[in-house]
């Protein structure tokens, strides 16, 4: 079954499978299934065409998913960088944005370590 250009895994429960679509988390998936009248523990492979169509329609009409959600997020970050606010500067420098420590941690955001050679000990005479 495809939703918003994403193939959903057939062997998983509907609530879990929907989270494979970018922009749909656990809470949103539960809301979609509740509005479509589908039990969250039903497998995707067990859904009939009408139920699949109902999910597709809800997602297409009411939610920003995949490319649209990614694009909006990128525009929001670009706006922060353009206005030159603190958060924008942190994004531009690839540093943590939300106040985390950077002296010892933040390796995910900063990337691999750039090794700097230590001072050489002066030879004794």
UniProtKB/Swiss-Prot annotation:
- Looking at the record's lineage, which domain of life comes first? Bacteria
**Keywords assigned:** Ribonucleoprotein, Ribosomal protein, RNA-binding, rRNA-binding, tRNA-binding
The UniProt record lists the keyword RNA-binding = yes
> Where are the residues of the annotated region Disordered?
92-125
What does UniProt give as GO cellular component? cytosol; small ribosomal subunit
Q: Which is an annotated GO molecular function term of this record?
A: structural constituent of ribosome
- Pfam families in UniProt: Ribosomal_S13
Q: Where is the composition biased (Basic residues)?
A: 107-125
- GO terms under biological process: translation
| Family according to the record | Belongs to the universal ribosomal protein uS13 family.
Role played = Located at the top of the head of the 30S subunit, it contacts several helices of the 16S rRNA. In the 70S ribosome it contacts the 23S rRNA (bridge B1a) and protein L5 of the 50S subunit (bridge B1b), connecting the 2 subunits; these bridges are implicated in subunit movement. Contacts the tRNAs in the A and P-sites.
Q: State whether it acts alone or in a complex, and with which partners, per the record.
A: Part of the 30S ribosomal subunit. Forms a loose heterodimer with protein S19. Forms two bridges to the 50S subunit in the 70S ribosome.
Name listed for the protein in its UniProt record: Small ribosomal subunit protein uS13
Instruction: Give the taxonomic lineage as stored in the record.
Output: Bacteria, Pseudomonadati, Chlorobiota, Chlorobiia, Chlorobiales
